[in-house]
Every structure is written in structure tokens, then in C-alpha cells.
Swiss-Prot record:
GO cellular component terms, semicolon-separated: plasma membrane
Organism expressing this protein natively: Treponema pallidum (strain Nichols)
KW Iron (keyword) present: no
Lipidated residue numbers (S-diacylglycerol cysteine): 18
Stretches the record annotates as Disordered: 241-268
Signal peptide: 1-17
Protein name as annotated: Uncharacterized lipoprotein TP_0693
Length: 440
């Protein structure tokens, strides 16, 4: 009977008097608010990852409703809208909720466990699937309605950090978006595609904190919830013990305002769902350097791929430059080691091989790949090298990933070799070293 009541309640929330679907975007800056849209990152940069927050801390309460949050600076909250599920999908979706999987999702939502609900949907919903059945269309509509209930609100944070509270809203109900995954993106070079992406994971209270990246060219960075990545990466977000400790010195540094937008989908006759995006402003004060764990024993393993797409096992240029950059930033107990099959075997096999060799002598494993995206003459007859990197950080004692990053940078030179070496040098000494110093 309780389960039936929960199912009826969720359906009444989803289908009763909901407005048309929109995109909600947020803009933040140090001096005021605007409602402009935020451009998406370059298509050449994949979704990356990662830092999170220690789950379940006492100060992570989201009892404060976004509608009543007032962080100062003349901020205001404009209530967004929740999309509807078309009537033609009701029967198929009702049949789904009568199944065991549907009942588990209903139970999870009724208890506010949004993380469990999204994980149940992971095995059932694939946004890239071409399968066109009544059930897949109903699930698609249901997921879209869930995503439209996501809201971001400012959170008190120390001067060096930004704080955000993520919630899932339906009318009068507000649930924390438990361990929701968001992508932080910022420009690191003059070229359009020169960006760094870091995935931030909210804690069990839907709260996330992160330091404002010192390497960002702009005083604003972009934070987005990716609708394509519907469910969180279990290897990162499901590990509470792997999440970084939350800073404590409170000081409000951001404010938010959503602006409803939408693009018509001519095929479906309804607005297309875009990512929830916000711009986060740098702290107005002059923050001290974010504290970094520089003394943790660390091994670096990076495999470089050349312009032909083949792995370069005879050189280790990017890893060597990264080691030099970290040593300049006063990291200690850090070194290079063999590749453990990076690029040839799954990541878990790489980690297992490293664990077998090091035992308990090394705490962190930093490993990944680099790839030459472009190496050609530019319009001014100079050579241009576009280099992409993907990096992961594994913590052996915690048995979990703590960070994932992707980055792209561009360098030019008078010769092919010069642009190539410059790109790898900058990627290691500057780009990757800066992001590790900021987020580790």
C-alpha cells in the first residue's frame, strides 16, 4: 500500500499542471547578475573528471530552499519551469512503473534518494540509443522531466572556493541531488578549443565545493550538468571516502539566477533539453594558494600517441615535463615509472599491475594518455600542433579514483618538430601541472 501511495504521488507530481519544457541557464559575475546563455565547450574536448566533496558532513544541509536563498550582491531567484510528460507516453510509463525496476525507482524518489533513482535508470535508459519503442520513448520523456527539475543555488564557501547546492525540485518538494556529476570547464589558451574540463561530484547532500582554478584565463568559469551523462561515474562519485574534504571558513562568493530558454525540436514538436549551465565568478578577494597535498607519494605513467596515432613507447616527453612542472611547484615523493599497459589494457588492469609492484609504498597513481589531434601548417605557414590529454588519479589506500581531467592545448612553431615539442612541454609543465596543483 505504501509503495502504491508513493507511485501515485510521484505521478501526480510529474503529470499535474506542468508547463512546457525549457532550458535553464545561470549567469554569475562578481558585480551583478545577467541571464545570458553560456556557450558549450569545444566539441574536441571530451567530458572529463574530477574532484568531489566528503559526503555526509554536518554543514552540508540543503534545508534552505533556493527560492529563499539570499547571498547578497542584489541577487534574486527566478523560479524555473518543469516540463511535462506527453499524454501518449503515460500508458507505457505506467507499465514500466509496474515492473520491479520501476518500483525501485519510485521508492528511491519517495525517500529522496536521487542517486539511487538515477543509477536504476542507468541500465534502462540510453540517450544515444536508436531503439524506438513505446517504453524507450516513455523513459526518454520521464528522464527529461527529471532533468528539468534540477536547480543550482549558491552555497556559502571560503574565499578560495566556490560553493553550489544542487537540488531536484518538483513543485513543493526539494530533494538534494545526491552525488550528481557536473563538469567544470575553463579556457586555458587563446585558441577556442584550448580548455580544461574537471568533473565535480556533489556529496550526499547535493553540495559541491571547488577551488577557483588559477590557470583560467577568464574571471568566470562554466559549470554544467550534462544530460548525456545521465548517471554518475560509479568509479568516482560512488566512493564517499575518495571525496576531498570540504573547506570550512564560510564566506559567500557567488549568486545565481536561472533564465528559461528553449529550442524547438521540429521532429518531436517540443523544446529540446539543453545542459543546465552556470557561470561561476572568481572570488573578489585575493585568495591564498589552495592547500595542496604535495608530500603524498605519487607515480606518473603517461603514454604519448604520435601524429600517426601510434603509441610512442621510446619516449616519455609529456610525463617528464609533468614531473618537472610538479617539482617546480614543490611536490615531493614523486617520480616516473613504466606504463603498466596504459592504452593497451583496461584502466583497472593498469591499477592492478601498479598495486602489485608498489604494494603500500606509493599512495597515488597518475596515469593517462595524450594524443596529437592536429599537426599541420597554418595559414601563415607556421606549424600548429593541437594536443589532447586525458588524466586519471587513483588513490591506493582509498581504493578509488579521486580525479579525472581532460585538456587540450595548441602551440605553434617554425618547424613541425618545434610545434610538437612546445605542445607537449606546455601540456606537461603548465596545463597538467597547474590543474593538479589546484585540485589535488
Amino acid at each position: 500500500m505504501d509503495r502504491f501511495f508513493c507511485t501515485v504521488w510521484v505521478w501526480s507530481v510529474l503529470f499535474g499542471a506542468c508547463t512546457s519544457q525549457t532550458r535553464s541557464s545561470f549567469s554569475l559575475n562578481a558585480d551583478g547578475l545577467n541571464s545570458s546563455g553560456v556557450a558549450h565547450a569545444s566539441e574536441h574536448v571530451s567530458h572529463a573528471a574530477a574532484m568531489g566533496n566528503e559526503a555526509g558532513a554536518a554543514d552540508a544541509s540543503v534545508s534552505e530552499s533556493p527560492a529563499s536563498f539570499s547571498p547578497g550582491r542584489g541577487s534574486a531567484w527566478v523560479q524555473g519551469t518543469v516540463g511535462h510528460i506527453p499524454a501518449e507516453h503515460h500508458a507505457a510509463l505506467q507499465a514500466f512503473f509496474d515492473t520491479e525496476e520501476g518500483m525501485r525507482i519510485t521508492d528511491a524518489l519517495c525517500t529522496g534518494d536521487t542517486y539511487a533513482a538515477f543509477n536504476e535508470l542507468e541500465a534502462l535508459y540510453d540517450p544515444s540509443s536508436e531503439t524506438d519503442t513505446a517504453r524507450s520513448r516513455a523513459l526518454h520523456a520521464y528522464v527529461r522531466a527529471l532533468l528539468q527539475g534540477i536547480r543550482l543555488a549558491p552555497r556559502v564557501a571560503p574565499p578560495t572556493h566556490v560553493g553550489v547546492s544542487a537540488t531536484l525540485q518538483y513543485r513543493d518538494s526539494v530533494w538534494p541531488l545526491q552525488r550528481g556529476r557536473f563538469t567544470l570547464c575553463y579556457q586555458i589558451g587563446p585558441e577556442h578549443g584550448d580548455v580544461m574540463q574537471v568533473t565535480l561530484c556533489a556529496d550526499t547532500q547535493g553540495v559541491l565545493f571547488f577551488p577557483f582554478p588559477s590557470a583560467a584565463l577568464s574571471q568566470e568559469v562554466t559549470l554544467s550538468f550534462d544530460t548525456a551523462a545521465l548517471v554518475h561515474a560509479p568509479s568516482l562519485c560512488a566512493q564517499d571516502s575518495a571525496l576531498q574534504e570540504r573547506p570550512s571558513s564560510p564566506e559567500p562568493v557567488v549568486s545565481t539566477i536561472p533564465s528559461p530558454e528553449g529550442e524547438e525540436n521540429s521532429a518531436a514538436g517540443e523544446p529540446a533539453l539543453a545542459n543546465l549551465v552556470c557561470r561561476v565568478a572568481a572570488p573578489s578577494s585575493d585568495p591564498k594558494q589552495h592547500p595542496v597535498r604535495r608530500q603524498v607519494s605519487t607515480t606518473i605513467c603517461i603514454l604519448d600517441y604520435g601524429k600517426t596515432g601510434r603509441p610512442l613507447t621510446h619516449e616519455n616527453l609529456t610525463a617528464t615535463r609533468l614531473l618537472g612542472g610538479l617539482l617546480k611547484r614543490r611536490f615531493v615523493n614523486i617520480g616516473l615509472d613504466s606504463l603498466y599497459g596504459v592504452g593497451k589494457v583496461p584502466d583497472h588492469a593498469v591499477i592492478a599491475r601498479a598495486r602489485k609492484k608498489f604494494g603500500g609504498n606509493v599512495r597515488r597513481l597518475v596515469f593517462g594518455l595524450t594524443q596529437v589531434r592536429r599537426l599541420e601548417r597554418d595559414s601563415d605557414a607556421r606549424w600548429k600542433c593541437v594536443l589532447f590529454a586525458q588524466l586519471h588519479v587513483w588513490d591506493f589506500p582509498k581504493g578509488a579514483y579521486t580525479h579525472h581531467f581532460t585538456a587540450q592545448c595548441t602551440e605553434t612553431g617554425d618547424t613541425e618538430s618545434q610545434s610538437y615539442v612546445r605542445a607537449r612541454t606546455r601540456m606537461g609543465e603548465t596545463v597538467l601541472s597547474d590543474v593538479l596543483q589546484c585540485f589535488l
